[in-house]
Amino acid sequence: FADPKNDIAFKKIFGDENHKEVLISFLNAVLDFQGEQTIVEVELTNPYQVPKIEALKETILDIKVTNQKQEHFIVEMQKKDLGDFAKRSLYYTSKAYVNQLDAGKNYHKLKKVYFIGLLNFTMFEGQSCISRHLILNQETNTQDLDDFEFCFIELQKFSKPLGQLSTLLDKWIYFIKNASSLEMVPKEFTGNSALEQAFDSAQMYNWNREEMDVYDYMHLKAWD
């Protein structure tokens, strides 16, 4: 299997217009959406396309999507700690919020923006691999300004073995962290169509030469 932490593999697995159920399942699991919050439909702002190698220096292979409520979601995989990811996540989230309206338009039309960052390095103190960040009232601890939400998953802090994966989110994190070291789909992942599709998309024998070239380029670039 391809390494989902590789930018092009991540975008192919989670940003494919033809397999939206993968991204929907992942988002619902990460954000713990249930009931009326559950995402049932998404529209990809920047669906998967194989980028040209010569353009990759200027290309950010994130995933941008809106749900049935027109809320915005940004998902980004970051392999290396460049020291600016926190600031960058704030910038992209703010930009997605501002870009919803032209100047002078009705601010009530602004929709919530979620940022999900998957990190192959340690960014925050603490033991948990998942941290959620909101704007809270310091005195009452209430979330009165609720149009921004950030979720960071630090893959290096996730250490559960296959036998201890108890939630769908556990399985998604395990898949992203460990898929490239597996030779077959574990039995713990069978029976879930989104997870099975994710493994199918990661099967490199299904990839064309152009995708393989970009994957290899991104793999080498990660070691620069």
Pin down the residues of each PLM region.
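Short, charged alpha-helical interaction segments and adjacent helix-coil junctions
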Residues: 73-78, 170, 174-224
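Accessory alpha/beta interaction modules
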Residues: 1-151, 159-161
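Short intrinsically disordered coil segments
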Residues: 130-136, 166-172, 218-220
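Generic structural signal for hydrophobic core residues of well-folded globular domains
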Residues: 13, 17, 30, 156, ...
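Compact structured core domains
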Residues: 145, 152-186
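Non-catalytic, well-ordered alpha-helical scaffold segments
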Residues: 7-8, 20-25, 87, 110-113, ...
